[in-house]
Amino acid sequence: MVSVFLSTLLLSAAAVQAYLPAQQIDVQSSLLSDPSKVAGKTYDYIIAGGGLTGLTVAAKLTENPKIKVLVIEKGFYESNDGAIIEDPNAYGQIFGTTVDQNYLTVPLINNRTNNIKAGKGLGGSTLINGDSWTRPDKVQIDSWEKVFGMEGWNWDNMFEYMKKAEAARTPTAAQLAAGHSFNATCHGTNGTVQSGARDNGQPWSPIMKALMNTVSALGVPVQQDFLCGHPRGVSMIMNNLDENQVRVDAARAWLLPNYQRSNLEILTGQMVGKVLFKQTASGPQAVGVNFGTNKAVNFDVFAKHEVLLAAGSAISPLILEYSGIGLKSVLDQANVTQLLDLPVGINMQDQTTTTVSSRASSAGAGQGQAVFFANFTETFGDYAPQARDLLNTKLDQWAEETVARGGFHNVTALKVQYENYRNWLLDEDVAFAELFMDTEGKINFDLWDLIPFTRGSVHILSSDPYLWQFANDPKFFLNEFDLLGQAAASKLARDLTSQGAMKEYFAGETLPGYNLVQNATLSQWSDYVLQNFRPNWHAVSSCSMMSRELGGVVDATAKVYGTQGLRVIDGSIPPTQVSSHVMTIFYGMALKVADAILDDYAKSA
């Protein structure tokens, strides 16, 4: 595990409390690490993966003392690792450690591979992410029902589940004055996942308000609560933090209060390789999993009711493929006998990030982060007619090219997705780009195109799940619109940094700096982006939840089509990208799916 680092910052009684280390509770010693302790046993439910959705669903199921659950997690309990995980200001320091899966993509643009960051440990990626807490546009979630046929997956329903997960703290007067916003009707207060303002106790930088004043002059809404269903605009954001500014990862929220339940067992240091099935008249029924660490050391464990895959958007598709569920062409190449033909591992949608950074003058000193969710017109500016023309003339061509590249399998069904995205951007005023600004002596924008038209894939390369041989191929920028959008968002960030009220605090650009001329065209920005982007690590849709006709892998209750007793319950199932950070969606989704599982359990009792 990462070594523990403890530090205490003493502030006056009047100051907001900065990060204080959390109480250290030895959870790991109460968990299982010996696979023989569970091998051959039978549980009601087996959950493959102890990340955000896995731990949330495990906690909800085991509220019923009659339900026995086993969670199998490759990593360990890491929430005690001190500031490197607990302190939100240490974001990024955990990258490259044993708590980071650090998957490699196949060679992409210019033959570059990219690292895909994902948490390895109980809590999954909530251990290592930026713990930002926003929600998407309501029309995006409504489309899951209206466009993709997933009954019950609409904003009104999901909004209640998302609020049910949350325990929000109202910002202080000083935080509101600095640029935070809070609409109490959009927040839950009785949930498990704490949210509040990030605050290190230092004075607030005036740059947040300067950004708001700059975009307000352009007609952009400011100080919007980003959790109310229409996030377009500029505001400061909430984070998953407790009152001591400690990261509230999924293990701290859902496992720490519940790890001593007698009906909940957590096995660490092991990975699920494949699902075990028996054939029935109704098709294959999941009866357990094979887990272990290598081909010579692995075990079987059995599920009375269901197997629930929660290994994440990069890994859950692989478990299905190792189990014989997937595209025949992929399984044949890996020497796996096909059990069921489903479009597993395609339709994967991740975003891309670039950075525009400048020095801040001494007048801009202080802490703070603000986000600009920009719509289509705000992002593209003078280039909006060109971008609109692409959306109105190229969807058929893009769908054909994507299918030919292996990003999807059906041109007609993919065009439904593309038309949905076009409607969002041109008719529904959804946020198209996110510009995330950090201060503290700088004006730093990390920014990304939120709505990618590129479709990637992740597939196995052998029949042995423990060799860890797979091809993660996001296919970044193989769609021209995605590159244009990322370039336009980058250009917008540079323009905003030195105009309007922001000019007072601008003290010279450091990135791109001299690497890109100041009056760069969108074409020049595109060239720069290709050389300097990174993945955004928000991949979804590799086991899409949509009608089977449109390319779905799971139905509206997260059940894998054509099977019994098998669900995928993680970030691989949302059928679309969204204009937000994804934790709120995943928590709400996990609670909704948990209710569906419990409904089926009640019917079987």
Swiss-Prot record:
Post-translational modification: Glycosylation has no effet on the kinetics of glucose oxidation or the pH and temperature optima. It also does not increase the susceptibility of the enzyme to proteolytic degradation. However, it plays a role in pH and thermal stability.
Use case: The high specificity, high turnover and high stability of glucose oxidase make it an ideal enzyme for biosensor applications and such as the detection and quantitation of glucose in industrial solutions and body fluids. Glucose oxidase is used in the food industry for removal of residual glucose, e.g., desugaring of dried egg products, and as an antioxidant in the production of beer and soft drinks.
Keywords, in A-Z order: Cell wall, Cytoplasm, Disulfide bond, Extracellular matrix, FAD, Flavoprotein, Glycoprotein, Oxidoreductase, Secreted, Signal
Cofactor requirement: FAD
Molecular function in Gene Ontology: beta-D-glucose oxidase activity; flavin adenine dinucleotide binding
InterPro entries, per database record: FAD/NAD-bd_sf, Glucose_Oxidase_domain_2, GMC_OxRdtase, GMC_OxRdtase_N, GMC_OxRtase_C
Active site positions: 538 (proton acceptor)
Effect listed in the UniProt record for changing residue 581 to A/V: Completely abolishes activity
GO biological process, alphabetically ordered: secondary metabolite biosynthetic process
Known catalytic reactions: beta-D-glucose + O2 = D-glucono-1,5-lactone + H2O2
Gene3D superfamilies linked to this entry: FAD/NAD(P)-binding domain (3.50.50.60), Glucose Oxidase, domain 2 (4.10.450.10), Glucose Oxidase, domain 3 (3.30.560.10)
EC number annotated for this UniProt entry: 1.1.3.4
Effect seen on changing residue 91 to F: Slightly decreases the affinity to beta-D-glucose
S-S pairs: 186-228
Subcellular location: Secreted; Secreted, Cell wall; Cytoplasm; Secreted, Extracellular space, Extracellular matrix
Annotated glycan sites: 111, 183, 190, 335, 375, 410, 519
Temperature dependence: Optimum temperature is 40 to 50 degrees Celsius.
GO terms under cellular component: cytoplasm; extracellular region
Pfam families cross-referenced by the UniProt entry: GMC_oxred_C (PF05199), GMC_oxred_N (PF00732)
Binding site for FAD: 52-53, 73, 101, 121, 125, 129-130, 132, 272, 571, 583
Additional facts recorded: Glucose oxidasde, as many other enzymes when extracted from the cells, has relatively short operational lifetimes. The enzyme rapidly inactivates on storage at pH 7.0-7.6 at temperatures between 30 and 40 degrees Celsius, with release of the cofactor FAD and molten globule formation. The exit from the protein's native state has been simulated and a common set of amino acids is regularly found to initiate the denaturation (residues 65-68, 166-168, 262, 265, 275-279 and 464-465), suggesting a moiety where the enzyme could be strengthened by a suitable amino acid based modification.
Family listed: Belongs to the GMC oxidoreductase family.
Binding partners and assembly: Homodimer.
Task of the protein: Flavin-dependent enzyme which catalyzes the oxidation of beta-D-glucose by molecular oxygen to delta-gluconolactone and hydrogen peroxide. D-glucono-delta-lactone is sequentially hydrolyzed by lactonase to D-gluconic acid, and the resulting hydrogen peroxide is hydrolyzed by catalase to oxygen and water. Alpha-D-glucose, mannose and galactose are poor substrates for the enzyme.
Protein's recorded name: Glucose oxidase
Provenance organism: Penicillium amagasakiense
Taxonomic placement: Eukaryota, Fungi, Dikarya, Ascomycota, Pezizomycotina
